[in-house]
């Protein structure tokens, strides 16, 4: 079973990807990991990608698709795989179909923007230890202080409301169109169309996990 997991930053994809990977014994595949492995192995595609990256460019889709084709032939993908952060564009999704790389399931984790902003902008971190808190969901015993050391907690630049809103805009502009693309494919029902499921991403992590696994088992 090959799965693509879609959803905005902060929707909980990382947590759920781990659960899916464990439940179905399939590896998570990220383009970043594939690129690093190919460069390290000095494969033909890896060297082509390295040349582009060294020049500060974006690795073109044909190289990425080539890496995907190689990766899914490896032994650990015998049961399938879970694509993490790929495809990002409709062009990449089209290229997967053109190359005959069949996808079985699309899972969208749906969380409204305001909920994501609340989740992400409420995070606080103790820099020295990496301990994380949340002002609503997991507050420290004393506001703004680490439970163990009593030292100040900080908000990372990535977690400010302004930054989160910018990241959400990029997602809506660039990646969200994929949701419509795959939803329409499922409605059309062509032979190579993956099954599309929209999962409510608000609630207990365990319930969301069960909803996703149930959708994948249907």
Curated annotation (Swiss-Prot):
Annotated GO CC locations: cytoplasm
Primary residence: cytoplasm
InterPro entries, sorted: Adenyl_kin_sub (IPR006259), Adenylat/UMP-CMP_kin (IPR000850), Adenylat_kinase_CS (IPR033690), Adenylate_kinase_lid-dom (IPR007862), P-loop_NTPase (IPR027417)
EC number: 2.7.4.3
Entry keyword annotation includes Kinase: yes
Domain of life: Bacteria
UniProt record, GO biological process: AMP salvage
Ligand binding (ATP): 10-15, 123, 132-133, 203
Protein's pathway: Purine metabolism; AMP biosynthesis via salvage pathway; AMP from ADP: step 1/1
Catalytic activity, as annotated: AMP + ATP = 2 ADP
Localization per Swiss-Prot or TrEMBL: Cytoplasm
Keyword Cell cycle assigned: no
Keywords: ATP-binding, Cytoplasm, Kinase, Nucleotide biosynthesis, Nucleotide-binding, Transferase
TM spans (from-to): none
GO MF terms held by the record: adenylate kinase activity; ATP binding
Region of interest (LID), residue spans: 122-159
NCBIfam families: adk (TIGR01351), PRK00279.1-1 (NF001379), PRK00279.1-2 (NF001380), PRK00279.1-3 (NF001381), PRK14527.1 (NF011100)
Record's subunit section: Monomer.
PANTHER family, A to Z: NUCLEOTIDE KINASE
Comment block on domains: Consists of three domains, a large central CORE domain and two small peripheral domains, NMPbind and LID, which undergo movements during catalysis. The LID domain closes over the site of phosphoryl transfer upon ATP binding. Assembling and dissambling the active center during each catalytic cycle provides an effective means to prevent ATP hydrolysis.
Protein name: Adenylate kinase
Lineage: Bacteria, Pseudomonadati, Chlorobiota, Chlorobiia, Chlorobiales
